[in-house]
Amino acid sequence: MPTIATEGSPNIVVVMNESFSDLTTYLEGYETSTDPMPYVRSLMKRDDVVSGTCAVSSDMGTGTANSEFEFLTGNSMAYFKGNTPYVQFIDAETPSLASLLAGRGYSTMAMHAYERAGYNRVKVYDRFGFEAYKGIEDFDVDLDYARGYPTDEANYRQLISYFETVDEPTVVLFFGDHEPRLSNEFYSSWFTDENDLDLETTAQLHKTPFFIWGNYSLSTESIQKGSVVSLNFYGFVPDGRVQLSPYQEYLADLRMEHPVITARYFTTAFGDKVGTAPSAFTDSIHEYQWLQYNCVFDRAHRIPGFYS
């Protein structure tokens, strides 16, 4: 949230929802007896809400920290295949959306409904520039689910309804971190061989819905309704009310050429999907790879002011 010094800048609430998915968007003929998310679906259809699809690098049912990494840093797991940067590489201060906003006068907090130490988050969030971090140990939560799980739909409605009544400008960015991992029998009923999928089907299995909602009229120039973007491009501060870093401006230009860059494929400006073999890389993707190296590893020679 912004401090007094940044009055007029919006509160920015980011909700990364565990395994949030809409199977009806890619399983032809898939039906449920009742719609499990009528409120969210209706919200995403509203003209004043920007919604679309996030292409994710993480595997089905796992890889939350890698989705966080892409969103918060603007870097892509295309160059970290088989790795978990939170555990292996974030061993010093690293530019992120949190440090950018802190530099713009915001106070920043991360919250996660898991143990604080999971995926090395205590150290990583500090190195990303978060001022505070709360894990499951910091909440007075009844973990006895014998009475059933809380209803997500009710919580989403409560969140949006609350901020509709708040006078301060507020924007909510909502997305899923990865697809859920369902039973092998479920997938075998839809795909001949889950381990031998074409690029189009692979893309369908690695995407989640997103929406951007504000309690004021949002500018939709950065991401259009119906867009398909990878998470490294989704972590933009929307609406132009907060100054972007030169790196974010670079990413905005790169997204025009390659809207999706994940660990599995990238897309061209025309929507064509291309595998991630290095021989297929364009000059722009090679340049992006170099900038990621400069950001994460080459700290002694990090471009001054470029990432902040």
Which residues fall in each region the model found?
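Solvent-exposed soluble domains appended to multi-pass membrane proteins
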Residues: 2-308
